[in-house]
Amino acid sequence: MPNWCSTAYVIEGDTQEVKALYELMKGLEEQEKPTVENGFGTAWLGCLVDALGGDWHDVRCRGHWDGLDFDGYVLTFWTETAWATCNEVFELVRQKFPSLCYYYRAEEPGMGDYYTNDIEGRYYPERYLIDLSTDKGDWHTEYFEDRTSLYEWLEEIAGVPVRSEQDVQSLEERWEEINPDAYININEFKVFED
């Protein structure tokens, strides 16, 4: 069984090309049966590869998309894929629709991989993700652009000063004394240029 990678995408470019891609993906979703037999359904990335004229055997496409939305300018959706992003699919999209570019933010918590290609933070400015369970068992997951705002938020949750990684570790230790299931995970998104 793989670790699953959740990836949020934004695709922008020439409006007609964005719309054409949206209509292609929406049409695939609405099929009664997938165009290529698979275990993911009609929104399998391999169906998109096939519709673009590619061979799904040659392109990493182990997963599906969901949450498809077109606001008239940009296309947004997310994917759930095995182990990592399936950006090869979107490189194929770019071959068919040359004006398009894609931005993504990927999270694969099983291996602690968090990354984005949104260098300027145009769509995904957050560089940190905190996931925690307090001493009272309250769960929180939040995104932050910088450590300062993360620490300020954590300070509000905890009711004690938090200004450094050492403060976070001390807080986690105090919470664990009260509730052994308490934890604080801070994940930093690596920024890659595709």
Model-derived features: positions:
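Intrinsic low-complexity, intrinsically disordered or marginally ordered coil/linker segments
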Residues: 1-194
